A protein has these predicted regions:
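Carbohydrate transferase catalytic cores enriched for Leloir-type hexosyltransferases
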Residues: 2-497
């Protein structure tokens, strides 16, 4: 790949449309984190970033209002759906006579089934607004929508992602076509069954093939295959060499014999978001003492609550709770280690579900008081947990890349990880082999021993908390800057070539 000269605005003047599917979900994990990073760096390179959402709020009640009033209400409702999720339409009769609700539901189900036949969107169906039109808008101060500070405007296309998913269920791969005239590039943040028209650059992001490799992932395999096949005509961002290799072996079957170069893989930036004061301080960053309620004030004379943690006296698991993340294996290994009896805790930030897997996890946790289930945490709390942990634990069966492990390695936080290919790739970056330790997940005793060893090795950190947090912060700023610079260079090359 040719090196772009070190100018600050590679994409100045480019209008780039980015998909918002994962930003529409209730929890911002994984791909949503990648989406935010992509938006931020496109903006930093001078691009005018627009967000494609499938939310198209109800406006039938606004027809008698002035156009400008309609516009601000439409904008407000769109942003509200980005915060809370899609609002289902209800008629006035349904509101007045609740009995009619069941007929409304049947009507909406019929409408949804018709999307199975929706194969094309015209330019006139797109509706958009610029965020600069919203003067002093309260929605733009909501933490969940912080990524909008790097977005020029919102493009609404009613249920475009749902239509593409339904179409991908068909026997043949037939991507949904969209007229995107007026934009310079269209970038998806995950594989989508879409085909843009009238646009010079189309880039799809491929994170993994897990839905095809691992049946318990519970995703329709034909549908996911068609989403991946829709990536073939596009330029592609593969988030790891492992994903790139698997894509070439199983999807891009005509190019198996081609050499896979480093151009095929783009290492995404780490996800921890530091306060602006620390981001700007660089190598002079000061300590960032914990502020989360999960890390109680050590100066307090009151006894520690079971819902609190002590800095550098816990191990961290920061992932969603699903079978491939192997949390059940981890909680059993922690229980076997006996660390809970020594005051060391296991902090699990993933939100448990109502399925049988989460039920099995709960049964182990019920008998192991050293394990703390926090549920989903916000970005500030996540940063606190990373800065004050003894180590990160990631025993995944398979990963597309492994952002939690990348975050840990950038901080210089020790990470005990499974030996899947994606983790090994992170292990081989920079000096990460000093911090990332791949361990087989065939025997839980191996993990119990590793947890005991890492705890004993870093037992002194509790006595030099400020020094250790500053070391991690300064290292993170230095390493992440290198990764971000390379990321921007590769994205700019894809857009401009």
């Amino acid at each position: 790949m040719s090196i772009i000269t070190n100018t600050p605005k590679h994409l100045q003047g480019k209008r780039i449309l980015v998909t918002a599917l994962d930003l529409e979900q209730r929890e911002h994990r994984g791909i949503a984190v990648y989406s935010k990073a992509l938006i931020r760096h496109l903006r930093r390179m001078g691009a005018e970033v627009w967000l494609l959402t499938q939310f198209k709020p109800i406006t039938s009640d606004l027809r008698q209002l002035p156009k400008e009033t309609q516009r601000i209400i439409y904008s407000s409702r769109t942003l509200n759906e980005l915060v809370h999720g899609k609002t289902l339409p209800t008629s006035k009769l349904e509101q007045l006579i609740p009995f009619l609700t069941k007929f409304g539901k049947r009507y909406r189900q019929l409408r949804r089934s018709l999307k199975f036949f929706k194969t094309s969107f015209q330019l006139k169906e797109l509706r958009s607004f610029r965020l600069s039109e919203l003067s002093d808008n309260p929605n733009l101060r909501i933490n969940r929508l912080d990524y909008l500070q790097d977005v020029e405007g919102i493009v609404s296309l009613d249920d475009v992602y749902e239509a593409s998913q339904l179409t991908a269920l068909k026997k043949q791969c037939k991507p949904v076509s969209i007229d995107l005239q007026g934009f310079d590039a269209f970038i998806t943040c995950c594989p989508l069954n879409l085909k843009p028209r009238n646009i010079p650059v189309f880039i799809q992001t491929v994170h993994d093939l897990i839905a095809l490799e691992y049946a318990p992932h519970n995703e329709n395999m034909r549908q996911f295959t068609h989403r991946l096949q829709a990536c073939l005509p596009a330029k592609r961002i593969h988030v790891s060499s492992s994903t790139c290799r698997k894509f070439h072996e199983h999807i891009s079957v005509n190019s198996i014999g081609e050499a896979l170069s480093s151009e095929d893989t783009v290492v995404q930036p780490p996800s921890l978001y530091l306060p602006s004061l620390h981001r700007n301080a660089g190598g002079q960053a000061n300590d960032l003492p914990p502020s989360s309620h999960l890390l109680h004030d050590q100066r307090s004379k009151s006894k520690s609550k079971t819902s609190s943690l002590k800095p550098f006296r816990y191990l961290l698991f920061n992932s969603s709770v699903e079978a491939r993340k192997n949390l059940l294996f981890l909680v059993k290994a922690f229980a076997q280690s006996g660390l809970g009896r020594d005051g060391i805790r296991l902090c699990v930030t993933g939100k448990l579900k109502s399925d049988s897997y989460s039920k099995s996890v709960r049964e182990v946790v019920a008998n192991e008081p050293g394990i703390l289930l926090t549920g989903y945490v916000d970005e500030a709390t996540k940063l606190d947990l990373y800065l004050n942990a003894l180590a990160l634990l990631s025993p995944s069966l398979v990963e597309g890349f492994g952002i939690p492990v990348l975050d840990a390695a950038c901080l210089g936080l020790p990470a005990l990880v499974s030996s899947c290919d994606a983790h090994r790739e992170i292990h081989d970056l920079f000096d990460f082999s000093d911090y990332v330790l791949p361990i087989s997940i065939l025997e839980s005793r191996d993990w119990s021993s590793a947890m005991q060893a890492i705890t004993g090795l870093h037992n002194d950190l509790a006595h030099k908390q400020e020094e250790e947090r500053m070391r991690r912060l300064r290292r993170y700023l230095r390493i992440s800057a290198e990764i971000e610079a390379r990321f921007e260079e590769q994205i700019a090359q894809l857009v401009l070539s």
